Regions:
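Glycine-/small-residue-rich beta->alpha transition segments that form the dinucleotide
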Residues: 19, 149, 158-160, 164-169, ...
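Short acidic, glycine/proline-rich loop/turn micro-motifs
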Residues: 27, 173-178, 353-355
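Short beta-alpha connecting loops at secondary-structure transitions
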Residues: 33-36, 59, 180-183, 220, ...
Length: 355
C-alpha cells in the first residue's frame, strides 16, 4: 500500500508493524506460487466464478471482480521489484493450474520491505502493536499502540488509516500439542486484533461465522496444493481408493471428504505420490523450500522421497481469515469501511475470498 500511495501522492506515510515487515505475518517464510493470477486464456470473470463456487456463493461479486481485474498488474509490480517468476522456454510464465503461476518466493517479504525502506517520507515502526483506533463522530483520527519490547505508548494521528493486520488464529485447539502448538497453518501471532479494533470502534463487519479449515500435510502443516497441482496427486484413503470425487473438489469438500473417510474407518488419507518420477521428487522438495521447508526436511529425515511414500493429509483447526472466506470488515469496492477514513485490506477485509 505504501508503494502505491507513494506513486500517486506525496503524503506522509507511517507503517506500524507488530513484528518486523521483513518477516512478519502471512508468507513470512515465503511462498512458491502466486495463487491468484489470471493466466493466459482466462479473464477476471473466470476467477470470480471460481471463487463463488468454492465459497458456495457466499461472496460479494463486486469485490471479487475489482480484485481480479488488478491481480496481474500487482504481480507485474512484484516482478519489477525483484520477485523471480518462473518462465518456460518461450518466456511465458509457468502456470500451475488455471489460476496460479510458479515463483521462487522465499524472499517475497524481504523484497517488499526493501522497496518500502527505500521510499522517501515513509516511516516504518517495527515492534509496535496497535491496539485501538482513535475515532470521533464515526471518522478515523488515528490509532494507539505499544512497543512490544519496552511497553512505550504511541499515539499516531492520521487522516486515513489502512488496517491490514491479518485474520485470527488460536481460536480452536491446534492439531499439534505441547511445544508444537504453534506448528499451524495460519500465523499464530495473527490474533484478530484488527477485527477487535473495528468492532470496538463500531465498524460494520460481516460473515464471521464462515471459518476456514485448511487441508494440509500431516505434522508439517505444509500446503497440499503444491503436490495436488504440481504432480497431479489424487486424494486416496488407506484402501487405495480415490475418494475426492465422491465428495466434490471445492476447498471445503476436499477437507470434509478427508474427515468423513477417517470417521468411517477408511483413514488415514493421503495424496498419492508413490510412483512419480525422480524429477518430480526434486521439484517438490525444491518447491517446499520456498514456503514450508519442514516438509522437505521430513522427506530427507525419513530417507524416503515422495515417489516412495504417499503424503498423509489432514484438516487444520478453523480460522477466521478473510483471504479464504468472506469474513471481516464490510467494505465498498474502494475497500472503505463504514468508518470514514478507515480502509481494510487482506485477511481483515470481508466479502472477498480467494485473495
Amino acid at each position: 500500500a505504501a508503494l502505491t500511495i507513494r506513486e500517486k501522492s506525496d503524503a506522509s506515510i507511517i507503517i506500524a508493524e507488530k513484528a518486523n515487515i521483513k518477516r512478519s505475518g502471512c508468507l513470512a517464510a515465503g511462498v512458491n506460487a502466486i495463487n491468484a493470477y489470471i493466466v493466459e486464456g482466462r479473464k477476471p470473470e473466470d476467477y470470480v466464478e471460481y471463487a463463488k463456487k468454492d465459497a458456495d456463493d457466499i461472496v460479494r461479486e463486486d469485490l471479487l471482480l475489482t480484485m481480479s481485474e488488478r491481480l496481474n498488474e500487482v504481480t507485474a509490480k512484484m516482478e519489477k521489484l525483484g520477485l523471480v517468476i518462473l518462465k518456460d522456454e518461450n518466456g511465458r510464465y509457468v502456470a500451475r493450474g488455471n489460476r496460479n503461476i510458479k515463483i521462487n518466493g522465499e524472499n517475497i517479504k524481504p523484497i517488499l520491505a526493501d522497496a518500502v525502506n527505500s521510499l522517501e517520507n515513509v516511516i516504518v515502526i517495527n515492534r509496535l502493536n496497535i491496539t485501538d483506533y482513535i475515532v470521533k463522530d464515526n471518522t478515523i483520527l488515528g490509532a494507539v499502540g505499544f512497543n512490544i519490547d519496552t511497553g512505550e505508548a504511541y499515539e499516531i494521528r492520521a487522516k486515513k488509516v489502512l488496517c491490514a493486520t491479518g485474520g485470527a488464529a488460536g481460536l480452536y485447539k491446534p492439531n499439534n500439542p505441547g511445544f508444537s502448538r504453534h506448528k499451524m497453518w495460519y500465523p499464530p501471532f495473527n490474533t484478530g486484533a484488527g477485527f477487535a479494533m473495528g468492532i470496538n470502534a463500531g465498524a460494520e463487519m460481516t460473515t464471521f461465522e464462515m471459518r476456514f479449515i485448511a487441508l494440509r500435510c500431516k505434522d508439517t502443516i505444509a500446503p497440499t496444493g503444491t503436490i495436488a497441482q504440481g504432480v497431479g496427486a489424487k486424494q486416496v484413503n488407506s484402501l487405495g481408493e480415490v475418494y475426492e470425487n465422491r465428495y466434490g473438489l471445492t476447498t471445503s469438500q476436499r477437507v470434509y471428504g478427508t474427515v468423513r473417510e477417517n470417521i468411517e474407518g477408511r483413514g488415514p488419507c493421503y495424496l498419492r505420490t508413490e510412483g512419480i518420477s525422480s524429477e518430480q521428487d526434486e521439484s517438490l522438495k525444491k518447491a517446499y523450500l520456498n514456503m514450508a521447508p519442514s516438509q522437505t526436511l521430513k522427506w530427507i529425515e525419513s530417507g524416503k522421497n515422495p515417489s516412495e511414500q504417499n503424503v498423509e493429509i489432514e484438516g487444520t483447526e478453523p480460522y477466521i481469515v478473510g483471504g479464504h472466506t468472506a469474513s471481516g470488515y464490510w467494505v465498498d469496492t474502494n475497500r472503505r469501511t463504514t468508518i470514514n477514513g478507515l480502509y481494510a485490506a487482506g485477511d481483515v477485509a470481508g466479502g472477498c475470498p480467494q485473495k
